[in-house]
């Protein structure tokens, strides 16, 4: 079996908003990597045994006395090191160079002129008309390196940054003041490939097929002939987890699908058809709509609704698990960003790996072992694996749907009537987005039920019914978002269909709020 962890890159995080993007780019190249906090110990680095190390950017200033520094062992480990932005600055400082606060800060696009050819910039050039090769890059820095460490050479400059890139080829140390991990840097992926593959010598074994083979083998080794229970929601993470487990242990996997009455139109039937009929998984469908809606009566505060939905799910799941007395393992669709977030929130350090209970926390008395086959993977990798396992692309690329479902898309108190109305309205919205070619042009779209009534006219009669809001946004990372400028004729068609086809809705509005100041979801 292919050892997909044999060659690996260690990324030390100094707090940049782009750090996870570095990891995703390295994985995209085909090499495994992990993201740890900057203050790891020598023992931890030795144990990980990286083939190369990348120092990320960060918001701090190396001119400050107590700013973060890379562990000294990083520069004594005998492996290549790439410093990006702050990572380059701390490399320079720690190896005897000097940094200063710049009079001319660089934020945004810049052109770096290459002054020397080294292994990092081999065959890179974005401007063939220039005397020296040039790269179109993305800068985001206020400090700059003003004096090189011994044995380093300047490899790149900009008009306001005399040392935009540097290298010591003998020790295989490299620094770039720009961000190769962002798509704005045109040859960024090629630069990272030069470092990871050509300089570090990593083999590109991190592929969907090899990841599946490795995951299946590890599941078999972990659980053996034991039985496993999984809460299957129909979302990407739990779906891919289910198929990996099914491939590894077959009928020893018991999937529990909880229909809470807060799902999209016909979603429960679609999940059963896909995983029960098509893939042959062992699925228990629990119709718990009444139980959820009863528990939610009188609750209108968003966080209280979320907590109630999470608690009822745990109770329902617990009831079903008690019926399966031979189950010894609980499977979860935890992915790598969950692991990073969980560790950081508990300790402030990304390298302390803790379990992330994405089902809201299970009772201690269940005493089940934990199986998390996706915990090393980013979301885009999970989708690629799902595709390789046979899941349809349209399912894997669906817009995000919140864990509480319609519980946070019905404003105020949740009632079955409201859920039914917003479900049907949203189905029309999605249908028209697909038909018009807009579904995959926007990052997320959904319908919100507004608990207000307004007067409308149908034929010769007046009606006094509910209102819904349509929401569509465009975003790269969901941290910020712009409202999508859908064509007026499309919005008009969607509105007319909803008002005419969904009895109980008399008004449709379109949300034109960006994030910030608004959030993407209303609750």
Curated annotation (Swiss-Prot):
Domain (GMPS ATP-PPase) ranges: 206-398
Signal sequence, renumbered to the chain: none
Biological pathway: Purine metabolism; GMP biosynthesis; GMP from XMP (L-Gln route): step 1/1
Molecular function (Gene Ontology), one example: ATP binding
Residues in Glutamine amidotransferase type-1 domain copies: 8-205
Keyword DNA damage appears in the UniProt entry: no
Catalytic activity: XMP + L-glutamine + ATP + H2O = GMP + L-glutamate + AMP + diphosphate + 2 H(+)
Oxidoreductase found in the keyword field: no
E.C. code: 6.3.5.2
Assembly information from the UniProt record: Homodimer.
NCBIfam families hit by this protein: guaA_Cterm, guaA_Nterm, PRK00074.1
Name of the protein in its database record: GMP synthase [glutamine-hydrolyzing]
Organism per entry: Glaesserella parasuis serovar 5 (strain SH0165) (Haemophilus parasuis)
């Amino acid at each position: 079996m292919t050892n997909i962890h044999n060659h690996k890159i260690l990324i030390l995080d100094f707090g940049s908003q782009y750090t996870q993007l570095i990891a995703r780019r390295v994985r995209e190249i085909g090499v495994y990597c992990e993201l740890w906090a900057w203050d790891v110990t020598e023992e931890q680095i030795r144990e990980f045994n990286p083939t190369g190390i990348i120092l990320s950017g960060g918001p701090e200033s190396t001119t400050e006395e107590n700013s973060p520094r890379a562990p000294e062992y990083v520069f004594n480990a005998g492996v290549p090191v790439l410093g990006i932005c702050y990572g380059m600055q701390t490399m320079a400082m720690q190896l005897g160079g000097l940094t200063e606060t710049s009079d001319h800060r660089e934020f945004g696009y810049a052109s770096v002129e290459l002054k020397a050819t080294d292994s990092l910039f081999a065959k890179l050039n974005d401007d063939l008309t220039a005397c020296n090769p040039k790269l179109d890059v993305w800068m985001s820095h206020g400090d700059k390196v003003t004096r090189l460490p011994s044995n380093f050479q300047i490899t790149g400059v900009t008009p306001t940054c005399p040392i935009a890139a540097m290298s010591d080829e003998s020790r295989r140390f490299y620094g770039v003041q720009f961000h190769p991990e962002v798509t704005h840097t045109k040859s960024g992926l090629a630069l990272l490939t030069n470092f990871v593959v050509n300089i570090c010598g990593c083999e590109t074994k991190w592929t969907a097929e090899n990841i599946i083979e490795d995951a299946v083998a590890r599941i078999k080794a972990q659980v053996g002939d034991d039985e496993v229970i999984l809460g299957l929601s129909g979302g990407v993470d739990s779906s891919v987890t289910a198929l990996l487990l099914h491939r590894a242990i077959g009928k020893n996997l018991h999937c529990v699908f909880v229909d809470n009455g807060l799902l999209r139109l016909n979603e429960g039937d679609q999940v059963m058809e896909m995983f029960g009929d098509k893939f042959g998984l062992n699925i228990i469908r629990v119709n718990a709509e009444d139980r959820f809606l009863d528990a939610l009566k009188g609750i209108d505060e968003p966080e209280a609704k979320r907590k109630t939905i999470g608690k009822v799910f745990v109770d329902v799941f617990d009831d079903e698990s008690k019926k399966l007395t031979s189950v010894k393992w609980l499977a979860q669709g935890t992915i790598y960003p969950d692991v990073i977030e969980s560790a950081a929130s508990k300790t402030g350090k990304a390298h302390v790996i803790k379990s992330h209970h994405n089902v809201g926390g299970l009772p201690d008395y269940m005493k089940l072992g934990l199986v998390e086959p996706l915990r090393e993977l980013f979301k885009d990798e999970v989708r690629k694996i799902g595709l390789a396992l046979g899941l349809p692309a349209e399912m894997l690329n669906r817009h995000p749907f919140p864990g509480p479902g319609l519980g946070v898309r019905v404003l105020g108190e949740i009632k079955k009537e409201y859920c039914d109305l917003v479900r049907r309205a949203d189905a029309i919205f999605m249908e028209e987005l697909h038909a018009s070619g807009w579904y995959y042009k926007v990052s997320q779209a959904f319908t919100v039920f507004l608990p207000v009534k307004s007067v409308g006219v149908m034929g010769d009669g007046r009606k006094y019914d509910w209102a819904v809001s349509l929401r569509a946004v465009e975003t790269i990372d969901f941290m910020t978002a712009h409202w999508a400028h859908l064509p007026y004729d499309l919005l008009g068609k969607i509105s007319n269909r909803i008002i005419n086809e969904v009895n109980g809705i008399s008004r449709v509005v379109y949300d034109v709020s960006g994030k910030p100041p608004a959030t993407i979801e209303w609750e």
